From Swiss-Prot:
<keyword id="KW-0413">Isomerase</keyword>
<comment type="pathway">
    <text>Carbohydrate biosynthesis; gluconeogenesis.</text>
</comment>
<dbReference type="InterPro" id="IPR035990">
    <property type="entry name" value="TIM_sf"/>
</dbReference>
<feature type="binding site">
    <location>
        <position position="204"/>
    </location>
    <ligand>
        <name>substrate</name>
    </ligand>
</feature>
<keyword id="KW-0324">Glycolysis</keyword>
<keyword id="KW-0312">Gluconeogenesis</keyword>
<comment type="function">
    <text>Involved in the gluconeogenesis. Catalyzes stereospecifically the conversion of dihydroxyacetone phosphate (DHAP) to D-glyceraldehyde-3-phosphate (G3P).</text>
</comment>
<comment type="similarity">
    <text>Belongs to the triosephosphate isomerase family.</text>
</comment>
<keyword id="KW-0963">Cytoplasm</keyword>
<dbReference type="GO" id="GO:0019563">
    <property type="term" value="P:glycerol catabolic process"/>
</dbReference>
<dbReference type="GO" id="GO:0006096">
    <property type="term" value="P:glycolytic process"/>
</dbReference>
<dbReference type="InterPro" id="IPR013785">
    <property type="entry name" value="Aldolase_TIM"/>
</dbReference>
<dbReference type="GO" id="GO:0046166">
    <property type="term" value="P:glyceraldehyde-3-phosphate biosynthetic process"/>
</dbReference>
<feature type="binding site">
    <location>
        <begin position="9"/>
        <end position="11"/>
    </location>
    <ligand>
        <name>substrate</name>
    </ligand>
</feature>
<dbReference type="InterPro" id="IPR022896">
    <property type="entry name" value="TrioseP_Isoase_bac/euk"/>
</dbReference>
<feature type="binding site">
    <location>
        <position position="171"/>
    </location>
    <ligand>
        <name>substrate</name>
    </ligand>
</feature>
<feature type="binding site">
    <location>
        <begin position="225"/>
        <end position="226"/>
    </location>
    <ligand>
        <name>substrate</name>
    </ligand>
</feature>
Amino acid sequence: MRKIIIAGNWKMYKTQAEALEFVQVFKSKIEDTDESREIVLCAPFTDLGAMSKNLHGSRIKLGAQNVHWEEAGAYTGEISGAMLTEIGVSYVIVGHSERRQYFGDTDETVNLRVLAAQKYGLIPILCVGESKSQRDAGETEKIIINQLKRDLVDVDQNKLVIAYEPIWAIGTGDTCESSEANRVIGIIREQLTNKNVSIQYGGSVKPGNIDEIMKQSEIDGALVGGASLNPADFAQIVNYK
């Protein structure tokens, strides 16, 4: 049985005070949300400790946005899996296109991060997707299959979430047609040994398109960027019909 997982990726937004204010408002808007839907908030590192205390006993799971592959060491500015699990983090985004584009993540380092996350009991949300030029060149399928091949070496697919995020649709307002997202996610599923991995769509998800996205047979949730910053908008997404 594939689990529905809706995750908000706050990126580099929200101070601790803003995060706690969000949680207070958001909690009140999801009291009647279908219990089978997993709700995750992936917040900046500085928010996680305070949010963990605030979310204790609630149905909302806490997620981080990155994790280093080493347990400890002279890696200035990095955070390990052990540090995240200690403060109650359950999920971690790995391989987001912004990490690949701006911070030099490769399929090899993404694979190390996924393995480290699993080692410390975190569920990685592995992001894969093609750029505009790759899509225009008809390379979508090839690019994604290659990413998966490299990113999933030795990975336990029973403790994994995948997010298909077409890079050209992130933060641009351009949403991939839901039928096309469904087709690509079907291709992703074909590459997996565990066909029950939850696969999300990410890329300009908002209250106005979530119903259509979630009607698709292959799509098991969403990785939501900008629209997750507003508690009313994110609640609408979580409460899709």
